[in-house]
Amino acid sequence: MSVVNQSFVQDVDAVLSAQWNVGTNTKADAAAGIATIGDDGDLRFLLTRVAVSGQGVLGSAAVDIPDGDYALRVDEVAFPVGAIAHRHTHTGSGWRHLVNGDLRIEAEHDTTVMHAGDSWFEPAGSPVRAVALQTSGVTRFVRCMVIPANFVGVSTFQLHDPADAALPRLQMTHRHFDHLVQVDAG
């Protein structure tokens, strides 16, 4: 799976492509853009059989595609000032792209501060904690994951420590779509 911007012009054989276009919303309570299946957006997520590289590629990594049916999910996560996504995992692997603000990502083996325009990959089942660093406005990222079909319409978010469920959860997730891909048995 790869995340690319508008300067990516290669002809690739994508299994599936999702696009996200910047909108006008700047508040945390609604999506900041519009996502659809397609390949002509401000930001694109390409599910390909081989890694892509070159101009416009913001990141590319191998993604485990579940056996049988699966879905491509595109959503946005908005962090108002003070928001923390406590250590958690997701059922699906995928790319994130920071649209606004600064976000500290505390992964299993390192900590990185992401700035608007940065992209990062999170493998399925890999614990991560995210802390919004801005003092005003909203920090927001767009995410595209490959998820098992049984998670269509269901959150993939799983707290790593159940005790964290008692902590405040200020971030808001805005799901654009789950696009089901049915695998032909023959």
Name each model-derived stretch.
Residues 9-43, 67, 79, 107-128:
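Short acidic-glycine-tyrosine-enriched beta hairpin
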Residues 43-45, 74-76, 95, 119-121, ...:
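Conserved hydrophobic/aromatic beta-strand scaffold that supports enzyme active sites
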Residues 62-110, 184-185:
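Surface-exposed interaction/gating patches
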Residues 89, 99-125, 129-159, 164-186:
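Compact recognition or signaling/catalytic modules
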Residues 14-32, 90-105, 141-148:
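Short, conserved beta-strand element in jelly-roll/cupin
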Residues 28-57, 124-152:
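Ligand-binding loop in jelly-roll beta-barrel domains
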Residues 1-15, 33-70, 159-186:
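A short, N-terminal "cap"/entry segment at the start of jelly-roll beta-barrel domains
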